[in-house]
Amino acid sequence: MSAQALVCLAPGSEETEAVTTIDLLVRGGIHVTTASVASDGNLTIVCSRGVKLLADAPLVEVADGDYDIIVLPGGIKGAECFRDSPLLVETVKQFHRSGRIVAAICAAAATVLVPHDIFPIGNMTGFPALKDKIPAEQWLDKRVVWDARVKLLTSQGPGTAIDFGLKIIDLLAGREKAHEVASQLVMAAGIYNYYE
């Protein structure tokens, strides 16, 4: 059975981060379920730049599924929606407590994970302009940060979304599959470490 990913979407989510991650996971053979965290339960999500995405289901219907990872795209308005959703916050906490992977990109780490103190010891990165919202002892200025101690994956923004997606494939389907997907994307040799 292939790995299962739950990708959360909210009004104002950053579309490049969401779509790139979803696309790469599917290419990597990972089954993706998209969940709307919109307060009205609407499945049509208007992202940060006006792109509309259609979620598979409201989070309330899929939160208890058997997923290996939960993914939180950035976009400040979307991340604020995540932060303000008791169901989303509790779902992320459940993933963490059960030893499953939590992945957050861009504004999501500083806006969702830190205020709710979900990872008090996890190393993380995020959107550089929000660096001051992440405790200095946890901040790493890297494109992608994987903290295996707490199963936390974080990344910086739209320009790091491919790296983020490939790291998720590496974690769920193996390095060989990540290399295969990187090759399909015509990634320049030397830019991404799956070519090493």
UniProtKB/Swiss-Prot annotation:
Enzyme class name: hydrolase
An annotated GO BP: DNA repair
Gene3D superfamilies the UniProt entry points to: 3.40.50.880
Catalytic function, reaction form: N(omega)-(1-hydroxy-2-oxopropyl)-L-arginyl-[protein] + H2O = lactate + L-arginyl-[protein] + H(+); N(6)-(1-hydroxy-2-oxopropyl)-L-lysyl-[protein] + H2O = lactate + L-lysyl-[protein] + H(+); S-(1-hydroxy-2-oxopropyl)-L-cysteinyl-[protein] + H2O = lactate + L-cysteinyl-[protein] + H(+); N(omega)-(1-hydroxy-2-oxoethyl)-L-arginyl-[protein] + H2O = L-arginyl-[protein] + glycolate + H(+)
Residue positions of the active site: 106
EC number annotated for this UniProt entry: 3.1.2.-, 3.5.1.-, 3.5.1.124
Post-translational modification: Cys-106 is easily oxidized to sulfinic acid.
Residues spanning the membrane: none
Gene Ontology, cellular component aspect: cytoplasm
Chain positions found as Cysteine sulfinic acid (-SO2H): 106
Record keyword Cell inner membrane present: no
Complexes and interactors: Homodimer.
Matching PANTHER family: PROTEIN/NUCLEIC ACID DEGLYCASE DJ-1-RELATED, PROTEIN_NUCLEIC ACID DEGLYCASE 3
Name of the protein this chain belongs to: Protein/nucleic acid deglycase YajL
Gene: yajL
